[in-house]
C-alpha cells in the first residue's frame, strides 16, 4: 500500500521522502542535492509525510 501512495506523490515530495526514509540521507544532504536549504528539505519531507498519512487513512 505504501508503494502505491509513494508512486502517486508529486516531485519533489516523493524524492525527498525516499531519500530520507530509504536512502537515510540527512536533511542537509537532501537540501544540497536539490540546491536548496536544509529547512526546505525538512519542510518538504514533513509535507510528504502528511500527504502519505492522508492517503493511507
Regions flagged by a language model, labelled:
Residues 16-20:
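A short pre-motif secondary-structure segment
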Residues 1-4, 14-15:
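Pre-recognition alpha-helix immediately N-terminal to the DNA-recognition helix
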Residues 33-57:
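DNA-recognition helix of helix-turn-helix
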Residues 7, 11-12, 23-40:
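Helix-turn-helix DNA-binding module
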Residues 21-22, 46:
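Short acidic-aromatic loop segments in the C-terminal HATPase_c
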Amino acid at each position: 500500500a505504501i508503494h502505491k501512495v509513494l508512486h502517486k506523490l508529486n516531485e519533489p515530495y516523493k524524492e525527498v521522502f525516499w531519500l530520507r526514509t530509504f536512502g537515510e540521507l540527512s536533511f542537509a544532504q537532501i537540501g544540497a542535492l536539490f540546491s536548496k536549504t536544509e529547512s526546505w528539505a525538512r519542510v518538504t519531507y514533513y509535507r510528504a509525510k502528511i500527504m502519505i498519512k492522508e492517503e493511507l487513512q
